[in-house]
Amino acid sequence: MRLFIGVELDEPVRTAAATVMRSLAARLDAAAPDFQARWIPAARLHITVWFLGEVADGPASLLMEQLRAPLPVPAFELELRGCGAFPRGGPPRVLWIGAGAGAEGMTEAFGELARRLATLGYAPEARPYSPHLTIARVKDPGRAVRAIRQILAAEPATCGRMTVSALTLFRSRLSPHGAAYEPLHRVPLA
């Protein structure tokens, strides 16, 4: 099964993020008509902490056992604000809303999760963890890469704050209509 660990959004933040996405989509369509992106449906918005990929049933059981105990990280307030794109240079491939105040809590939770997952042979990606909310995957940035980056930088994208008190292990089921996410297990923060 395809698994990842992430943070579920509360409804006010999810609603605010959907509003930001609609605003950005309209502004990008007007400024860059050849820009093509697949916007993430609001119901599937989450903050990915760790993508595990395909995991067989046996290792998945071990994974859930390893995630049974709370992470030794206190619950924290997380603010989502500001927009950007990955990669930071070159044509954008992923559009995101960033983590503002409280981002250090996400980084601390990621570090504790990394220590726990290392016992099962999982290693973090080579690049540093950068907490963010993916809002779109770019199919074709078109010819207006500079305009896209300017629009993203100018978007105020204030989505509010939420309390992060747990991480969630999700199962991702892919279909022609996109991915469906099923929460399997919640890992509380201590």
Predicted feature residues:
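Histidine-dependent nucleotide/RNA phosphoesterase domain, centered on the 2H-phosphoesterase fold
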Residues: M1-A190
